[in-house]
C-alpha cells in the first residue's frame, strides 16, 4: 500500500492530460511522411526523364540533396544512358571511301571476251633441253670448221712467208718484218731499223743478204759513208 501511495503521489492528473508530447510525436511522424512522399515524387519525375533519354547533365541537375541509395541509382542510370549514347554513335553509318567505290565500279564494268585466233604461221618452240646426240653433233661441226679455218690461215701465212722478201736487200728470213717505203712488212728487221732512223742508203746491205758485195756494199754506216764519198770522187768506179 505504501508503494501504491508513493506511485500515486508521483503521478498527477495534469501529466495524464498533458498531450503536448503526443502532438510533437504526431508532427514528427507527419513530417517524415511528407519527406518520404517528396522523395518518391522526385524519384518518379527522374525516372520519367530517364525514359525520355535526356542527357546525363539534366539527370544529375535536380534541386535538393538525395540519400546515398538514390545517388547510387542515379549513377547507374547515368552509366546506362552514356552506354546507350556510345552504342548509337558507334552503330552510325560512316562515310564511304570514294576510291573504294570507284574500284568496285571498275570491277563491275562488263568486258567483252577476247576472240580466239588461230595462229597458222607461228612456230612452236619446245621448252625442252636439246638431246645429247644433237649437242655432240653441233660441237663436232664447230670443231671441224675451226680446224679448216686454222689450216687455211696457216697455209696462207706459209705462202706469204715463202714469197716475202726484203725489198731492199732481198732477205727472206728475219725475226720481224718492218715498215718500209713500199708499205707495211716490206723490209727486214735490219733494214727497217735503219729506214726508221733515216740511215737506209743503197750501199747498205746486211751480211746475210744474197745481194751483198764487198766492193760496193757494207753493213757499217761509217763504211757506207766512205763508199759514197769514193763514188763522188771517182764516178767511173761505180
UniProtKB/Swiss-Prot annotation:
Q: Name one GO molecular function term.
A: zinc ion binding
Q: Where is this region: Disordered?
A: 24-64
Zinc finger (GATA-type) residue numbers: 160-214
Placement of sequence motif Nuclear localization signal: 112-119
Q: Where in the cell is it found?
A: Nucleus
Q: Which GO terms describe its biological process?
A: circadian rhythm; positive regulation of DNA-templated transcription; response to light stimulus
Keywords for this entry? Activator, DNA-binding, Metal-binding, Nucleus, Transcription, Transcription regulation, Zinc, Zinc-finger
What Gene Ontology cellular-component terms does the record carry? Answer: nucleus
**UniProt biased composition (Basic and acidic residues):** 32-45
Q: Does the keyword Transcription apply?
A: yes
* Described function: Transcriptional activator that specifically binds 5'-GATA-3' or 5'-GAT-3' motifs within gene promoters. May be involved in the regulation of some light-responsive genes.
Q: Which family does it belong to?
A: Belongs to the type IV zinc-finger family. Class A subfamily.
Name of the protein described by the UniProt record = GATA transcription factor 7
Higher taxonomy? Eukaryota, Viridiplantae, Streptophyta, Embryophyta, Tracheophyta
